[in-house]
């Protein structure tokens, strides 16, 4: 899907999230907010990262995931298994990762405030995201 921001936009987020097959696809980028959808294969990860100046909201539409957070990668203080219709709120400055612990693709959407990725960012795979020089928050 093409990034529709910063113009006004409405969509059925469940349909858009479940239809997405890319690791990450940016649906909308505004001045202070960004919406992405993700599809993570079984055993795959979003990737450990820290957003120093971004809060993040994640909702799982389908699948089973382990959400870990903490001050640092080697100091995990939050570990929760989540599934369909669960959310995770990630404060700025927290290390976090999401691991698909289910047997099917994990389908989720994420809201960043402010925007985390360049408008129109699309990564077909985790490897594509890891190789993108614009993705500097992975740790």
Enumerate the language-model features and the residues they cover:
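Short hydrophobic/aromatic-rich beta-strand segments that constitute the beta-sheet cores
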Residues: 35, 67-69, 108
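Conserved hydrophobic/aromatic beta-strand scaffold that supports enzyme active sites
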Residues: 26, 35-39, 57, 79, ...
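Conserved short histidine dyad/triad with adjacent acidic residue
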Residues: 36-52
